[in-house]
C-alpha cells in the first residue's frame, strides 16, 4: 500500500498541508531535535489561540453590526469562517505531533484533511473574488457609474458558489485520506494507488496549479488591467471624490492579499522544489519545512489584525458592541 504521510520528519499533523519540502511520499518516524520538538507545538498553540480570538471577534462584528453588512465584508466574513474552522481543528495537529501517531478514527482523519485543504484553497479563492469585485467597483467609480447587480444577495450567491468549488477541489484529498500503520504507529496518510510516484507528484502539482498559480495569475491580471485602464482615464471631480471614498476598502483588500501571499508563497514554492529536486532529509531541511508550514498556518490568525489596524469602521463597531454588551 502506497502512502504520503503527514508524519515525521515533516510537519507532524493529520490536517496540515503536504510536507513543505518533502521530495517523496515516504515517511519515517525519526527522533526530532529537542528544540524543534518543543517549538512546533508552542507555535501551533499560539496560532490557534490568536486565530480563535481574532476570528471570533471578526465574526462577532460582521454578524452583529448592521453597518458592516457590505459586499466586501461578506467576503471577509467567509475568509474568517474558513480561518476559524481551521484554528478550531489545529489542536488535533498538536495532539498528533505530541503523540507521534493518529489518536482518532479514519472518519476524523478524512474530515481534518478536508478542513485543512479548505484552508489551503479558500483564502486565495475568496481573495480572487474580492479582487474581481474591487476591479468592477473601482472601474465603475472612475466612469461615474454603479456596478449592475452588485448586491448583498448576489455576493451571498457568489460566496456559496466559491464554497461549492472549493468542496469539489478538496474532495480527492478526503477520498485518499486513510489510516495506515507505519513502523507500528497509526498515521493519518494519503493512500495513493500505483504508480505511487506519479500520484504523489500529481497531488503536489494539483495543489500548486489550482491552489496558487491560477488564482494568483487571475489576481495579477485583474490589478494590472485595472491600473492600465485607470492610467488611460481622466477622472472628473465627482469620480475623484468617489475614488477617494473607495480607496481605503481597496487598500484593505490589497493588504489582505499581500499577507496571504507572504504566508502561502513559500509553501507553494517549496512544492516546486519538491517536484524538481531530491533534498536530503537533514535537520536544517526539516526545520525549514516546519517553518514554512507554520507560516502558512499563521495566515489564519493575521487577517483580524489587518482589519483592526486598517479599518476604522471595524474598530468603531467592535468598541460599540463591547460597550453595549458590558452595559447590558
UniProtKB/Swiss-Prot annotation:
Pfam name, any one: 7tm_1
UniProt topology in membrane: Multi-pass membrane protein
Domain of life: Eukaryota
Record localization: Cell membrane
Glycosylation sites noted in the Swiss-Prot or TrEMBL record: 3, 13, 25
GO molecular function annotation: G protein-coupled opioid receptor activity; G protein-coupled receptor activity; neuropeptide binding; neuropeptide receptor activity
Disulfide bonds: 109-188
Free-text tissue specificity from the UniProt record: Found in cerebellum and frontal cortex. Detected at high levels in hippocampus, amygdala and trachea; at moderate levels in fetal brain, pituitary gland and prostate. Not in caudate, accumbens, kidney or liver. Also detected at high levels in lung carcinoma.
Family, per entry: Belongs to the G-protein coupled receptor 1 family.
Protein name listed in UniProt: Neuropeptides B/W receptor type 1
Gene that produces this protein: NPBWR1
Amino acid at each position: 500500500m502506497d502512502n504520503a504521510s503527514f508524519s515525521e520528519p515533516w510537519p507532524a499533523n493529520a490536517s496540515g498541508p503536504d510536507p513543505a519540502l518533502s521530495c517523496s511520499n515516504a515517511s519515517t518516524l525519526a527522533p526530532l531535535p529537542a528544540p524543534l520538538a518543543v517549538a512546533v507545538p508552542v507555535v501551533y498553540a499560539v496560532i490557534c489561540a490568536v486565530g480563535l480570538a481574532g476570528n471570533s471577534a471578526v465574526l462577532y462584528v460582521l454578524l452583529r453590526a448592521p453597518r458592516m453588512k457590505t459586499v466586501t465584508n461578506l467576503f471577509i466574513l467567509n475568509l474568517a469562517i474558513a480561518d476559524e474552522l481551521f484554528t478550531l481543528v489545529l489542536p488535533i495537529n498538536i495532539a498528533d505531533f505530541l503523540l507521534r501517531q493518529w489518536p482518532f478514527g479514519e472518519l476524523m482523519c478524512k474530515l481534518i484533511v478536508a478542513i485543512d485543504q479548505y484552508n489551503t484553497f479558500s483564502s486565495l479563492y475568496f481573495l480572487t473574488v474580492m479582487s474581481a469585485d474591487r476591479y468592477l467597483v473601482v472601474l465603475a467609480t472612475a466612469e461615474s457609474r454603479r456596478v449592475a447587480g452588485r448586491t448583498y444577495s448576489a455576493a451571498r450567491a457568489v460566496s456559496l458558489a466559491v464554497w461549492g468549488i472549493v468542496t469539489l477541489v478538496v474532495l480527492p484529498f478526503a477520498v485518499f485520506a486513510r489510516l495506515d500503520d507505519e513502523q507500528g504507529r497509526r498515521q493519518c496518510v494519503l493512500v495513493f494507488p500505483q504508480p505511487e510516484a506519479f500520484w504523489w507528484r500529481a497531488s503536489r502539482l494539483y495543489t500548486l496549479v489550482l491552489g496558487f498559480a491560477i488564482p494568483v495569475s487571475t489576481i495579477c491580471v485583474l490589478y494590472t488591467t485595472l491600473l492600465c485602464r485607470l492610467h488611460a482615464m481622466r477622472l472628473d471631480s465627482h469620480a475623484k471624490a468617489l475614488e477617494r471614498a473607495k480607496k481605503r476598502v481597496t487598500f484593505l483588500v490589497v493588504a489582505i492579499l499581500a499577507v496571504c501571499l507572504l504566508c502561502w508563497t513559500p509553501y507553494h514554492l517549496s512544492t516546486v522544489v519538491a517536484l524538481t529536486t531530491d533534498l536530503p532529509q537533514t535537520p536544517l531541511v526539516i526545520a525549514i519545512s516546519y517553518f514554512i508550514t507554520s507560516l502558512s498556518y499563521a495566515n489564519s490568525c493575521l487577517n483580524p489584525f489587518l482589519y483592526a489596524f486598517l479599518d476604522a469602521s471595524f474598530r468603531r463597531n467592535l468598541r460599540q458592541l463591547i460597550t453595549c454588551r458590558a452595559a447590558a
